[in-house]
Amino acid sequence: MTESIQLSQFEFIRASGPDARTFLQGQVTCDTTQITPTQSVLGALCNLKGRVIADFRAAQVGEDIVLKVGTGLAEPVLAVLKKYAVFSKLTLSKDDELAVLGLLVRGKGEDDAQSDTLPSGPHAVTSLGEGVLAIDAGCSDEGTRCVELWGNGPSIEASAALQTSSDARTPNKTVAVATISDWTRLEILSGVIHITPALSEEYTPAQLNYDISGVVNFKKGCYTGQEIVARMFYRSTPKKRLYPLHAEIPLASDAELNDSASETTIKPLAIAGNAMLALLDTDPLAREITLASEASVKLAVKEPDYFTK
């Protein structure tokens, strides 16, 4: 079964021109040479102090490089990038024509032939035609994986209708619909945190696990904030890491935690459904962590798969 979600929490930046790829290579944490028509990458833009302004997914759309960022961050990111783009042959702009729709692919049955058209490798990209890209989001849990569809509104809705049909040749007239909370919950359980305007320039890559989850490439050359990010990775051991937690009950949007290792309550960075992401002292699996408002509600800590890579 496949369900679709309008992911209105994202917007797009387009970099066009002969210098687009090389310019971005000198500004962001990912290796832009790894972006191909069949492969996207995750990355971040940092400030001079090594704090994350925005995270993004970068993909090749035609001859351009397109960045998907959190809603409200396209303009701040453009303002930073344009300061350094004066002598480069490229155009940087917010792309209001592109939209993103999420697919929750729940298992695979005998009649799910359409899922064979979707990418299966981490962050892989396939073209579905009509200008629509399908991108593996790198998130999965409990037999469900996340796939992004990029394109203009009517095109991605038509592609979603085809993907959610039990017959790959006949689109559903009524598309099975999930919610943004369903999508975010799977991201949280996979240890994925996205920067919002409220989180922008507040955290280092290490605090968000970007240094171990593939958002930062330590083999590429210099970029803004690189010296600080690299020093923290190679010369220090984080005292805190971002951990997914989940409860047996739905969590309030303002829920806070009590951790036996901390003297103060902890405010999570993201909450959806019964799951949350919170910065905890390392090695929390053996500690008791409860809701601050209801000590009888215990939360289970999960280590993301990238912890063991």
Predicted region positions:
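Short, surface-exposed ligand-recognition loops at beta-strand->loop->(often short) alpha-helix junctions
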Residues: 14-20, 104-107, 246-252
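Short amphipathic beta-strand starts and helix->beta connectors
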Residues: 41-55, 85-86, 126-135, 229, ...
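Residue-level signal for inorganic ion chemistry
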Residues: 17, 67, 105, 225, ...
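Glycine-rich, small/acidic residue-mixed loop/short-helix segments
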Residues: 208-215, 230-309
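Acidic, low-complexity central loop/insert segments
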Residues: 3-5, 11-14, 57-167, 171-190
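Anionic-ligand-binding alpha/beta catalytic cores of soluble enzymes and soluble regulatory domains
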Residues: 150-162, 171-241
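Acidic, proline/glycine-enriched N-terminal capping motif
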Residues: 1-55, 59-62
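Short, intrinsically disordered, mixed-charge
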Residues: 25-33, 75, 79-87, 234
